[in-house]
Amino acid sequence: MKAGMGAASLALLAACNNSPFPRGAERENTLYMAFAERSPRYLDPTSSYTAPESTYVYEISEPPYGYHPLKRPYTLIPRAAAEVVKPYFLDKQGQRLPDDAPGDQIAEAVYDIPIRPGLKWSPHPAFAKDARGQYLYHRLKPGELGDRRSPFEFKQLATREVVAEDFVYALKRHANPRLEAPVAPVFSEHVLGLKDYLATVKRESDKQLAGLPENLPDKPFLDLRQWPLAGAVAVNDHLLRIRLKGRYPQWQYWLATNFTAPVPWEADAFYAQPGMAANSMSMNRWPVGTGPFMMTEYVQDRRHVMSRNPNYRPDTYPCEGEPGDAEAGRLADCGKPVPFVDKVVAINVKERVPIKELFKQGYLDLPEMDRADWGVNLAVDRDDSDEVKAFFEQRGFQLPMTVDISNWYLGFNWMDPVVGQGDTPEQQKRNRALRQAISIAIDWEEGYGRIFRDKGGDAAHGPIPPGVFGAKEGQPGEFNPVTHRLVHGKVERRPLEDAYKLMEQAGYPGGRDAKTGKPLVLNYDFQRVVTPELKAENDWLIRQFAKLGIQLDIRATDFNQFQEKILKGKHQIFWWGWFADYPDAENFLFLLYGPNSKSQHEGENTANYLNPEFDRLYRKLQSLEDGPEKADVMAKMNDIVRQDAPWAWGYWSYSGLAFQRWVHNGKPGVVVRDRARYLRVDAEDRTRSIAAWNGPVWWPLLAFAVGGLAIFIGTRRAWAKREAATALGGSR
């Protein structure tokens, strides 16, 4: 028996591997990937507004529109809607105007959006009814939920058809004070009546909660259906009417975001029951949607599984793209039904190095879905040597690259007394000089052009990315005069001497307070736990501030804690990025619009920047179609923020994805968030490749055998010596 156990141990030793998945998982029709941060905080389509969350939200929820996965420039396509529509315009008397009517004549823009008939919600207990038509699980008493932590632990699951009223209800949810609603400030400026609706719902919510404990986890269901919203009406079951205040061309793009995806009232009623919050049952973990996938496994900070939605509508892979797509094999699946895979499995791997190694071994089909820098990172590795390049080519790693509309920047909290706006004209002048000095000192060209090339890009000169209408980034002679200058026809970063002068104007000569002599210490609120590779980037940033004599203190937290900090306005200097929601300058300029303040209005202006003239121009920009007037307004807004320097601008990142050779149809595209539905996996190729790349490791067996032989020889010699000694003693 001991011999059998030993043989088994040796066999296991030879066959062991570091696959994070069960044996045989590679043979399944499943897409495997990693996530490096904590689990997503918000999967509720009303609340979700981060790139890691979008990996799941856009596959589970379906807004009216989406983006063609292959065409560039980006092209809108219908998703939950039957078609992409143009608005019509009304004057103050409700009379219809021509499409080219002047903006000052337009009182309303009306979108009549046909909803696809036959759309069904994913299976969920919220829809289950008994024989009398009564909801089975809408009247749970305390304790009845038990230890159930997933909707799929309920006996009865059901569905129903999606109707226009579900889209109306979703828009109303942006007024619910119990939900995180980051775009409510934007929507309330445009959707007719939404601003008043916010006040109404807040008042009714307060009434409902009167007398209840403030920290009550399971608040009663706030039924938004009882209060009408003028700007969102269901004309019939399959026609949604949205009314906007005046012309707002960018609304078509908002219709392609999760914020306009339908939500069933039954889900809110279901989750607003005793015990749900304690058991982590909510739309933020178990959203109800109409998309190709549904969340079927959620293990906090460890593993998420999306499975094929059995109720998903008929959908097919596109048959056209842009030049080069056919040659790259991206049209080979023309007309085939999607999604291709049955499951999408994401596992938590904390650091980039192990993610990269798992990808190289074939265990991950792609590193991370939401990160557009993995292709850049691996391309740097590939080009490091001929040997590595040959290795990459032999394994067939796909690294498609592009320059996309996304950015990374260092921001200053406008509410902070040192780096923010300042309370007096004199303080405002000093703080602005400090921000400008820092903006000059941080050499983005060095950091993310030469050192951290795996995350690299081009230094930014303002908030408007190249590739959208009106952008001047990268054009000859175009630069930020605060941070750069023209030398012999070449744009160069201003010398540190210019930054030193600004430090003196700010009252910090040599990095010390001119009045007290104390060193200037600033806090850098970092949104991730610092790993060794992230430490290198942070150390580089510390050196940039040290050029000015400024001490930079790193205050690192995980992403969820960072979000809490910025909501309270407790941050000072921070690192942030933005992947465009839609291909328009407004989607970047709104990050600096005052009413979108993150800490004051829970918007996406994380710097809490406020400038009345910038805000006035932003409001004007919103009603302008692409043309000379819009370009002029954009230029003026660019000039304002360059002078104010609420951001240190950072860089425009390169976009590059990474796929195994057996993953088909992958293409970079920052606004295409529903990529998983289009990806096809050749499981047979994956199975063969993983077996070939990760064969049994025999050297431990050899070492074991050599060690065993040495022990045997040593034991034999000792035994022989003892026998000889015994024989010698006996002869005496």
Language model segments and positions:
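Extracytoplasmic/periplasmic ligand-capture domains
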Residues: 15-24, 69-70, 113-180, 205-233, ...
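A structural "hinge/loop" feature
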Residues: 37-57, 68-69, 77, 125-128, ...
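Extracytoplasmic/lumenal ectodomains and periplasmic regions of secretory and membrane proteins
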Residues: 635, 640-663, 667-668
